[in-house]
């Protein structure tokens, strides 16, 4: 059983460098890292780093295409590049826990399920009550936004399972689905600055 860690990236240089470095150390040798780079909006700095990764890390694949403002189509393009039995889709500015990566092969081998929803810890530095009220968010006493914020991330590489929706995309075509427990060590970590969050929300409103 092989896992494809599938990543989309545009201009997140510091984030993609940290993610690939950590993921390459945590994953098994037989699992692959697959990166889809937005050559239309991405930076030369990120592309140069990705080319460096091809010689620095084993079992990594890099592809450049143009993002056309449709997130489901973009993730379906990423699907086509993967060769694993399962795909773990990760955004460039996210980080999976070491416990999750260590245990994922066993979880997948012992549970015959099409999709696993992954809880996500979101934090936004600079977040104010004005932002919280405007976006109708929930923030707990740890500063986690909308926790457990389950994400569609781990799924079988099956032709009938595909992404849909231009934004806030979800998977369709699956027969079974389950959730990881809403505990920190099973989570993706997603830390942002308020400036980036505002820009992202404004962009989503245009789609």
Q: What kind of region is each of these model predictions?
A:
Residues 20-64:
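Acidic donor-binding segment of Leloir-type glycosyltransferases
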Residues 1-25:
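N-proximal low-complexity "stem/linker" segments adjacent to membrane-targeting elements
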Residues 72-79, 95-207:
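Catalytic-site signature of metal-activated, phosphate-bearing donor transferases
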Residues 18-22, 49, 77, 102-104:
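A short acidic, amphipathic alpha-helical/loop segment
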Residues 64-71:
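Short, acidic/glycine-rich phosphate-metal binding loop used to engage nucleotide
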Residues 87:
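Short aromatic/hydrophobic "clamp" motif used to bind/position activated sugar donors
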Residues 38, 90-92:
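Active-site acidic Asp-centered loop
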């Amino acid at each position: 059983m092989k896992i494809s860690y599938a990543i989309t990236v545009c201009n997140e240089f510091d984030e993609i460098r940290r993610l690939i470095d950590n993921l390459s150390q945590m994953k098994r040798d037989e699992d692959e890292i697959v990166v889809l780079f937005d050559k239309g909006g991405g930076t030369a700095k990120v592309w140069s780093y990705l080319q460096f990764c091809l010689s620095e890390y084993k079992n990594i694949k890099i592809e450049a295409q143009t993002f056309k403002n449709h997130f489901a189509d973009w993730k379906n393009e990423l699907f086509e590049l993967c060769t694993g039995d399962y795909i773990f889709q990760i955004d460039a500015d996210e980080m999976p826990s070491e416990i999750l990566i260590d245990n994922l092969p066993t979880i997948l081998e012992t549970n015959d399920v099409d999709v696993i929803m992954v809880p996500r810890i979101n934090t936004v530095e600079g977040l104010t009550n004005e932002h919280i009220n405007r976006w109708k968010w929930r923030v707990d006493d740890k500063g986690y936004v909308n926790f457990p914020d389950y994400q569609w991330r781990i799924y079988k590489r099956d032709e009938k399972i595909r992404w849909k929706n231009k934004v806030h995309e979800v998977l369709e075509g699956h027969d079974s689905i389950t959730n990881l427990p809403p505990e920190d060590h099973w989570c993706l970590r997603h830390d942002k600055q308020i400036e980036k969050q505002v820009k992202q929300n404004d962009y989503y409103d245009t789609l």
